[in-house]
Amino acid sequence: NVLYVKGEVLSGDTLHVLVCHLPSRLGATRVSRRHRMLAVRTVRAVADSVRTATSDARILWMGDFNADVEDRVFREVVFPYFREPGLSPFCADGVKGSYRYRGIWETIDHILVSPVLMDNSRPFHTSDGCRAIVAFPFMCEREKTYGGVRPFRTYQGPLYKGGYSDHFPVTLDFEWRFPE
């Protein structure tokens, strides 16, 4: 699933936003990886179309990629054209990713930007350390089996738990300067 939004930010710059939820890693690894790669190439094609129309397009690509940055999908398709701003060192106690499965933290939710958005000489930009994983106490629950905390999910299988998500949200701060 991909959502494309185009809008104008306060600095007057046009921002193109691509939001995706890539196929799960569950099931046959080779099949799910192939589906994720196909989905990423589809989103990249949309981004390439935007970039063809405007060479210095400000593009933000975000969502649940179901892959970490070491995955082949990032090396081959994403990182040649997008950057992921560095993560803020400030995170809730014990939280080391956006998702936890069987006691292991992973960051599979990403916010990527076109390189022009990392240029701090531009009126509208971001920089390393401006990306954060948000894990307020009300978003967490104690994990009995593996210890520590995990996201407080809405459902666990068919059981309604009353939480909000099985992933912590990822945010990105921007700065902008108005023309003098």
Predicted segments with their positions:
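Flexible glycine/proline-enriched surface loops and loop-helix/loop-strand junctions
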Residues: N1, P23-A28, A92-V95, Y155-Q156
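Beta-strand elements within well-structured catalytic alpha/beta cores of enzymes
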Residues: V17, L60-W61
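A long, amphipathic alpha-helix that forms part
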Residues: R30-S55
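Metal-dependent phosphoester-hydrolase catalytic domains
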Residues: K6, V50-I59, A67-E180
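Structured beta-strand-rich core segments of catalytic domains in phosphoester-bond hydrolases
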Residues: N1-L22
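A short secondary-structure junction signal
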Residues: G27-S32, V73
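A surface/extracellular/periplasmic glyco- and lipid-processing/surface-interacting theme
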Residues: E8, R36, L60
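Active-site metal-binding loops of divalent metal-dependent hydrolases
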Residues: L22, D64-F65
